[in-house]
Every structure is written in structure tokens, then in C-alpha cells.
């Protein structure tokens, strides 16, 4: 992809979307690593309320993704993006000015209510030519990864130097920068929006999107990969610490190396494989097979450190690959007048997968051992692979 292929006004909008994504991700992930520790020191706090403060963001994201997507289809993306950013800013200000866990919960809830990721991804897809969409999504994934790593590394340092509440002050300032990009970099509208709508027809069209076979497969895929991710984050770190118990920081280094290698391999794939191959249904089937292979390696070779690292490498290659191409597939198969709504359903499936993976993974690991949880994931991945093959046959 050559950046020269993109029109000047589109370049400005793309930069704006990238900045909004990166700054919001950086701000969000600065809070998560330290909230479980420092949240217990807040007024009226307990373990349950700290858990609520962590989880309420995702719950509100699930609730507001589809309404934001539908509204942006009717009233334009710029207005809805800026409303979401205002909610994010207000949430940060409330959390910063509060001295109790209840203020943090309210602030995190308002942050989550600014659920604009699907709207931004839809706009980004509209700004570039079809053959460049997967590549631009890949670059967005890289910026997401960089923001994530910087946030996780810097947040403990900032808290130790300036205190816990400083994170919300920084988040508030980042939110103001996001609003600047939202107001002055995002175009007013790319399409003529028809704000007059019939409620019954809107409900009918919504259920048509839900029942679309291609979109169902895509939504199932994003649900499952995030389900697997959260399950793995519950059980794999424990196993890594057992294997490398005498080597401090080795698990963290392994994760960093694996993610970097995965990003490079995926970038190579999206840059050199033809778009018609990437856009074909075989990509989901191939990725599903990689998940089956990954869990097969985990189960067959047991506690071997090499097999664990190899399995994780395959897992993250498949995960990042699908995370990169699925939004472009959603845009390809969605109706012109319901692109943001369709993307919102996709994002809701994503957050539901993360939530269910964390909950079910935690319950399973409470009653089952490491290999039994992996076997459960292995069976689910096989069923997914079979359904993707059946879809190809049909």
C-alpha cells in the first residue's frame, strides 16, 4: 500500500482515527495493570468492588456498541465519535476527582459508554480503497500493540512517581487531544445519511444482519478467538511461571518476543498475499485449523517449555491475523446503509467473547486442572474448524 494512493483529505482523517485509537488504548491500558493493586487502598473499597471497577468498562462497551453503530449510520460518524469521546473525557474527570471506589466505578462506566471503536473502524474502511483495507487494519493493529506495551510498561512507573490518580489526569488530557482530532481531522460525512426511518423496517434490517450467514461466521470467529485469548490468559501465565520459576522476567520476555514475531509474520502476509485470497472464506478455516494445531501441541507435549512457546507462537499468529482481516471482511459483506451497525455487532461479539472467556475460563480453572481446561478449548476449536469447513462446502 502506498500512502500516495490516498487522497489528501482522507490522509488527514486516517491520521485522526489512528491518533484517537492509539491515545484511547494507551489511556485504557494504563489503568488496568494497577487498578487491582491500588484500588484496594481507595475509600469504601473491597475485592468485589475492585472487580466491578475493572469489569464495568467492558460491560458498558457491550451495551453501547450497537446503539452507537446504528446512530452513526443515521446521523454520521463524526457526531457520534465526538459524543463518545466526550463520555470518555467525562468518565476520566469523574474518576480523577473522586476519592472512593464508587467514583472510579462511575468513571469507568462512563469511559465504557463511549463505545466508538466500531464507528471508527467503519469510517477507516470507507476512507481507503478495498485492496488496501486489510493493510490499513494491520497498521492499526500494530499501533494498538505499541500503545498497549507502552501503557503496561509506563503505568506502574507513573503511579510510583506521581500517584494513582495521576493516571486519570493523564487520561483526561489524552481525551482532550482525542476530541481535537475528532473535531478537526474527522470529515463531517462521507455518505448522505437518511435520518428519517421506520422503526419496524429498522428492526427487520437489524435481524437480517444478525441472520446473514457470512457475517454470522465472522462474528462467531471473533467471539471465539477472544474467548480463547481470555481463557489462555488465565491458565498459561501460571504454567509459564511453573516452567521458568527460577528465571525472573522470562515469561514477560517470552510474551514480548512472541507478539513481535507474530506482528511481523502477519504484516508480511497482508503485504504479500493477494487481497482476493485474504478476503476469501478459506482464511477463517485456515486460522481455525491453526487454533486446533496450537491446542494439540499444548496437549500432546505436556509441560515441555519448547512446545509451550511453539503453541503460543502459533496461537498469536492466528489471533493477530484474524484480528487484522476480520474487520475488513465485515466491511466487505455489510450493507451500504448499515456498515456501522454491522461493525457494532462485530465489536459486541468481540467484547462478549472476552467477557465469557474470562468468566468461563475462571470457573473451569477453579474445578479443573491445566490440561482439562486446554482439552475443553481444544474441543471447541475442533467444532469451530468443522463448522468453517461445512460453511465452505455449502
Swiss-Prot record:
Its main location: membrane. It is a multi-pass membrane protein. GO terms for molecular function: transmembrane transporter activity. Keywords: Cell membrane, Membrane, Transmembrane, Transmembrane helix, Transport. The chain crosses the membrane at residues 13-35, 50-72, 79-97, 107-129, 136-158, 168-190, 218-240, 250-272, 277-299, 309-331, 344-366, 371-393. It is found in: Cell membrane. It comes from the Bacteria. GO terms for cellular component: plasma membrane. It holds the Pfam family MFS_1. Belongs to the major facilitator superfamily. This is Uncharacterized transporter bbp_411. It comes from Buchnera aphidicola subsp. Baizongia pistaciae (strain Bp).
Amino acid at each position: 500500500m502506498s500512502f500516495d494512493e490516498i487522497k489528501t483529505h482522507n490522509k488527514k482523517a486516517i491520521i485522526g482515527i489512528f491518533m484517537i485509537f492509539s491515545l484511547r488504548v494507551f489511556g485504557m491500558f494504563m489503568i488496568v495493570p494497577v487498578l487491582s493493586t491500588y484500588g484496594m487502598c481507595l475509600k469504601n473499597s473491597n475485592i468485589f468492588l475492585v472487580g466491578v471497577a475493572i469489569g464495568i468498562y467492558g460491560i458498558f462497551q457491550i451495551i453501547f456498541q450497537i446503539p452507537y453503530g446504528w446512530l452513526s449510520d443515521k446521523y454520521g460518524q463524526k457526531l457520534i465519535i465526538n459524543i463518545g469521546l466526550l463520555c470518555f473525557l467525562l468518565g476520566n474527570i469523574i474518576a480523577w476527582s473522586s476519592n472512593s471506589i464508587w467514583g472510579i466505578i462511575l468513571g469507568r462506566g462512563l469511559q465504557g459508554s463511549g463505545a466508538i471503536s466500531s464507528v471508527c473502524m467503519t469510517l477507516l474502511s470507507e476512507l481507503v480503497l478495498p485492496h488496501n483495507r486489510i493493510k490499513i487494519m494491520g497498521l492499526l493493529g500494530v499501533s494498538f500493540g505499541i500503545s498497549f506495551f507502552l501503557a503496561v510498561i509506563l503505568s506502574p512507573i507513573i503511579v510510583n512517581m506521581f500517584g494513582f490518580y495521576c493516571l486519570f489526569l493523564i487520561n483526561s488530557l489524552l481525551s482532550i487531544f482525542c476530541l481535537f482530532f475528532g473535531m478537526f481531522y474527522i470529515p463531517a460525512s462521507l455518505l448522505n445519511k437518511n435520518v428519517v426511518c421506520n422503526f419496524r423496517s429498522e428492526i427487520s434490517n437489524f435481524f437480517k444482519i444478525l441472520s446473514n450467514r457470512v457475517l454470522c461466521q465472522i462474528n462467531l470467529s471473533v467471539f471465539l478467538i477472544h474467548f480463547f485469548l481470555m481463557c489462555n490468559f488465565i491458565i498459561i501465565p501460571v504454567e509459564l511461571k511453573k516452567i521458568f520459576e527460577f528465571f525472573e522476567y522470562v515469561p514477560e520476555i517470552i510474551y514480548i518476543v512472541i507478539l513481535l514475531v507474530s506482528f511481523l509474520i502477519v504484516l508480511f502476509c497482508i503485504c504479500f498475499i493477494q487481497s482476493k485470497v485474504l478476503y476469501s472464506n478459506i482464511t477463517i478455516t485456515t486460522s481455525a485449523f491453526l487454533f486446533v494445531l496450537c491446542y494439540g501441541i499444548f496437549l500432546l507435549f505436556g509441560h515441555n517449555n519448547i512446545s509451550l512457546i511453539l503453541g503460543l507462537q502459533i496461537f498469536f499468529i492466528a489471533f493477530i491475523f484474524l484480528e487484522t482481516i476480520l474487520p475488513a471482511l465485515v466491511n466487505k459483506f455489510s450493507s451500504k446503509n448499515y456498515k456501522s451497525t454491522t461493525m457494532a455487532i462485530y465489536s459486541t461479539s468481540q467484547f462478549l467473547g472476552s467477557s465469557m472467556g474470562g468468566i468461563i475460563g475462571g470457573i473451569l480453572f477453579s474445578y479443573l486442572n491445566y490440561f482439562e481446561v486446554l482439552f475443553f478449548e481444544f474441543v471447541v476449536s475442533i467444532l469451530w474448524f468443522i463448522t468453517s469447513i461445512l460453511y465452505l462446502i455449502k
